[in-house]
Regions:
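Short, well-formed alpha-helical segments that are part of the catalytic scaffolds
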Residues: 7, 11-25
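Acidic donor-binding segment of Leloir-type glycosyltransferases
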Residues: 20-60, 78-82, 87-89
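A short, conserved alpha-helix in the catalytic core of glycosyltransferases
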Residues: 166-182, 189-215
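Non-catalytic, C-terminal membrane-associated alpha-helical segments of glycosyltransferases
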Residues: 231-239, 250-305
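The conserved acidic donor/metal-binding loop of glycosyltransferases
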Residues: 94-99
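Conserved donor NDP-sugar-binding/catalytic core segment of glycosyltransferases
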Residues: 103-140
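Short, flexible, basic/aromatic active-site loop/helix in glycosyltransferases
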Residues: 141-164
Length: 305
């Protein structure tokens, strides 16, 4: 199985450079890596990385937005995979602040080779800094991967392969049959919240999407480059409703997701928890509800906030 990687980055050139270092240490080095930023500062310094100078990776710029940038990456891979059997290659999407274990790509490739019914994979996240104030440091990421630090409790932990309805966007791989046929929904702009669920939900028409415990890694959860609290809060309501309307998310899942986040935003605002902009998120929630009541709710409206 030939492995390809797409990295969409925004405001994190340093973190992306480090990820390229991790990819060069993979036991199955990717056949090619596409890095997609939205402006020069997103990719500053990356042109000097050996993977780029040696032609194993290349850098592109596009309009900003996770879904847009990932689609540009997929389109850029088209000539690289031309002539290959779509069942014999896969593409992995890593967040720029994800740190994969050395055998991540090899494990994913072997799983796809051994199990033709599997079309999508997400891995076991040993630590996830996305919900903490400062995230996980690069030094601690190494400790988690080396086993010097015990893994944190995370929903992605499992002892065996587990069938899922959605994959985790910071580390997910898809067989070529999916990557050739599907693109990310660009109606989910900017940070593209729940774009991973939408894409993997649509991928299930081609086979199973699963949690693969042997694909281990750490998500730093770096805060730079993220959407504002108000915008993110708007997306917390607008995006699930949009996906439920299009059929890639059940209304039950959407309602559970929205209520969980709304309650969390209220509680953390009242208790003045400041690790994230929870008052901003709550304001965004209310703006989305207002748009819903007036028939104007649209994920793209986040661009005007």
């Amino acid at each position: 199985m030939k492995a390809f990687v797409v990295i969409a980055t925004k405001g994190r050139s340093k973190e992306t450079y480090t990820l390229l270092e991790y990819l060069d240490r993979q036991t199955d080095i990717p056949a090619h890596v596409v890095i997609v930023g939205s402006e020069d500062k997103d990719v500053e310094g990356l042109a000097s990385h050996p993977s780029v100078t040696e032609g194993r990776a290349h850098i592109l710029l596009s309009r900003a937005g996770l879904t847009i940038q990932r689609n540009v990456g997929l389109d850029a891979l088209a000539p690289k995979v031309a002539g290959l059997d779509a069942k014999e290659w896969f593409v992995t999407f890593y967040d720029d602040d994800f740190r994969p274990a050395p055998n991540w790509l090899e494990s994913a490739g072997q799983a796809l080779k051994d199990s033709p019914h599997i079309v999508g994979i997400t891995g076991n996240v040993l630590a996830d800094g996305v919900n903490s104030e400062f995230g996980v440091s690069e030094e601690d990421a190494v400790r988690y991967l080396n086993g010097d630090k015990a893994p944190e409790s995370h929903w992605s932990f499992a002892h065996s392969v587990k069938t899922l309805t959605g994959l985790y966007g910071c580390n997910m791989a898809y067989r070529g049959t999916v990557a050739t046929a599907l693109r990310f929904d660009e109606n989910l702009p900017m940070y593209g919240w729940q774009e991973d669920f939408d894409y993997s939900s649509r991928a299930r028409q081609y086979g199973q999407v699963v949690l693969m415990p042997t694909c281990r890694g750490v998500h730093l959860g770096v805060s730079s480059g993220r959407t504002s609290g108000v915008r993110f809060g708007y997306s917390q309501i607008a995006n699930p409703i949009f996906l439920a309307r299009k059929g890639s998310m059940t209304w039950r899942t959407a309602a559970k997701l929205m209520s969980k986040n709304f309650i969390a935003n209220v509680a953390k605002t009242l208790f003045m928890i400041r690790i994230k902009d929870f008052p901003g998120r709550l304001k965004g929630n209310f703006q989305a509800v207002r748009d819903l009541m007036t028939g104007k709710l649209n994920p793209l409206h986040v661009l005007d906030i």
